[in-house]
Structure formats: structure tokens, C-alpha cells
């Protein structure tokens, strides 16, 4: 599933696809 983690990423969040 796609887990959206509020950490450093392209738009202020990181998209962690597991």
C-alpha cells in the first residue's frame, strides 16, 4: 500500500510505497 509519511520529501512529505 501507499504510506504517506510527514517527513522530508518533494513537497514537505515523503511518499513511502510499500
Swiss-Prot record:
The keyword Kinase does not apply. N-glycosylated. Keywords: Lectin. One of its GO terms (molecular function) is carbohydrate binding. The keyword Translocase does not apply. It comes from the Eukaryota. Lectin that binds galactose, galactose-containing sugars and gentiobiose. It is strongly mitogenic for human T-lymphocytes. Homodimer. This is Lectin. It comes from Euphorbia characias (Albanian spurge). The lineage of its organism: Eukaryota, Viridiplantae, Streptophyta, Embryophyta, Tracheophyta.
